[in-house]
Amino acid sequence: MIKLRLKRCGRKQRAVYQIVAIDVRSPREGKALRKVGFYDPIKNQTDLNVRAILYFLEKGAQPTGTVQDILKKAEIDKELRPNQTKFN
């Protein structure tokens, strides 16, 4: 199963995160299938590849709680087709 989750980058006391599509059995810092976005919690900046995110969501990927909140804030959940299920 594929999940959209955060992968930690940056340095000590200055974390930034990549939003990646990754297999659930992989470790947090493991090899990702594809990078689909970027999140900086200190500056509160996000950069999302909407096309790639929608592709993985249509294929059945599940976002983690934090990624789900980021996607809702960016209003990506409104771009899902009506017949597609919403986030859990």
UniProtKB/Swiss-Prot annotation:
Keyword line: Chloroplast, Plastid, Ribonucleoprotein, Ribosomal protein
Domain of life: Eukaryota
Location of the protein in the cell: Plastid, Chloroplast
Main subcellular location: plastid
Gene Ontology molecular functions: structural constituent of ribosome
PROSITE patterns given in the database record: RIBOSOMAL_S16
InterPro entries, alphabetized: Ribosomal_bS16, Ribosomal_bS16_CS, Ribosomal_bS16_dom_sf
GO biological process: mitochondrial translation
GO cellular component, one term: small ribosomal subunit
Pfam families found in the cross-reference section: Ribosomal_S16 (PF00886)
Keyword rRNA-binding among UniProt keywords: no
Disulfide partners: none
Record family assignment: Belongs to the bacterial ribosomal protein bS16 family.
Name used for this protein in its record: Small ribosomal subunit protein bS16c
Originating species: Jasminum nudiflorum (Winter jasmine)
Taxonomic lineage: Eukaryota, Viridiplantae, Streptophyta, Embryophyta, Tracheophyta
